[in-house]
Amino acid sequence: EIPGPLLEESLRQAGWEVIIIDHHRYDELDRRNPLSSLEQFLVIFQITPADLDNLGFDPRIIFGLGVMDRGFVWGLSPAGFSISESAQVRVEYRRRKNLLKGENAILIQSVKRAWETREQQDGVYIIRSDNKEHHIREEISFLLAESHELPPPAIIYEGDGRVTVQDCAQAPLLFAHFGGYTFGNELCWGREANSHPTLTPEQLLVLINA
């Protein structure tokens, strides 16, 4: 996802082969890919299930992590993962992200506060965090997944000013109007912290419900 087109071209001019692994769309750069970054990595380096097994990894878990990177929890079942396999992948995902309960007490408390004050407007969750040091989006996503059979749309405000709209078919429309970036198979949109004045839920809902 880095270092960016200018430096990438400089590297090419210097004789380096540059291979980009990314799956996002940014303001002035479209790097969408149906495969997640992990899945692309496995393909580019021709890493097989046997290779993963020899390296001490569970291939099924690794493939599941790749699916979660592009489709989160909701992508596992369509990709053929059983309920028990999905549970294993989720635990491993959170372990590697340092999200398991007790490993980051400050984050857990922030998520709890945000979750308790959640509200819904026009069928869309609105969730706000007061933590300027840690982002809560992924943990909130796990809570939404535990309480819903299908992914509900949500607007998540981070304490540092970042805003994310996820599980929303209008993510490309939000991108067209407000810039930022898309991810999650074009079902999620976000804008970096403090890059622009904070968008209100009302401003976002106009497009989400368009």
Q: Which ranges hold each PLM region?
A:
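Charged/polar, solvent-exposed surface patches and flexible loops
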Residues: 9, 13, 43, 63-67, ...
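Short acidic, S/G/P-rich loop/turn micro-motifs used as interaction or catalytic elements
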Residues: 3-6, 25-27, 72-74, 131-136
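Glycine/small-residue-rich interface belts in oligomeric ring/scaffold proteins
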Residues: 1-35
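Gly/His-enriched, cation/cofactor- and phosphate-binding structural elements
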Residues: 11-19, 46-53, 112-210
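Short alpha-helices
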Residues: 23-94
